[in-house]
A protein has these predicted regions:
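Proprotein-processing/basic-patch segments
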Residues: 174-205
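Extracellular-facing segments of soluble proteins and assemblies that are Gly/Ser/Thr-biased and enriched
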Residues: 78-125
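N-terminal leader/pro-regions and domain N-caps
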Residues: 17-73
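Fungal secretory targeting signals
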Residues: 1-18
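Extracellular and analogous surface-interaction loops
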Residues: 87-95, 156-160, 199-201
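Internal, hydrophobic beta-strand segments that form the core of beta-sheet-rich folds
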Residues: 160-177
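Short, surface-exposed tryptophan/glycine-enriched loops
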Residues: 131-164
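Generic short beta-strand segments
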Residues: 61-69, 102-104, 169-174
């Protein structure tokens, strides 16, 4: 299984660069047929996914996502995840890839405590290849966070079909501690949000 990981610095990847078709705007039709989800961070009815009108951004938001530590907090609360499978439908002759993510939420972490959130993406049937965006918290953090990441390399969806199943897994964790720490939804919006930018191109005939 290949894993392309991005942290605070961009990792260079030694790989042959394949030839693609012309980069273009999005297809006229780009919709989410359905979404299935599972995980401790997204109880039923607390996750929502939408595509913006431009067809170049989709957003996953979670309204009950909370990771915490403290003197009476059980170990099950130190780490949470939510895995979504998005069945995407669009006009034939196009393919897309992810070119960046913005993650926003709330963190309250004291000195000496570390934490991180990992957003991993893969296409169903893509030989296990995936890309991971990692947001790390180290030392004192208090308040809203809004962090942007861009990949060094990412996979394109297949040209063999005008549908794709994109898997997204959001996993956040804190180091075990008796000190109170928290990664959770933003206090204003009431959501922890992962916003993804999409690049489209026409398939080679």
């Amino acid at each position: 299984m290949k894993s392309f990981i991005l942290s605070n610095i961009l990792l260079g990847l030694a790989a042959a660069v394949p030839q693609y078709g012309d980069l273009s705007g999005p297809p006229k039709r780009f919709t989410i047929r359905n979404v299935s989800l599972i995980g401790s961070g997204c109880p039923s009815g607390t996750a929502h996914v939408q595509v913006d009108r431009s067809g170049t951004i989709f957003e996953a938001s979670f309204s009950a996502y909370q990771v915490q530590t403290g003197p009476t907090v059980p170990a099950s609360e130190w780490r949470k995840n939510c895995k979504l499978s998005l069945n995407l439908d669009y006009d034939p002759g196009f393919q897309f890839r992810l070119v960046g993510t913005d993650m926003s939420g709330f963190a309250s972490i004291p000195d000496g405590i570390g934490g991180q959130c990992v957003n991993s993406f893969s296409f169903a049937g893509d030989n296990g290849d995936r890309i991971e965006y990692i947001v790390r918290f180290q030392g004192r953090n208090s308040g809203r966070f809004d962090l942007h990441s861009t990949p060094g390399l990412s996979s394109w969806s297949s040209c063999e079909s005008n549908t794709s199943i994109l898997n997204l897994n959001t996993a956040c964790e804190l180091e075990p501690s008796n000190h109170r720490a928290l990664i959770a939804v933003d206090e204003v919006s009431g959501k922890l949000t992962v916003k993804c930018a999409i690049q489209w191109q026409r398939c080679l005939k």
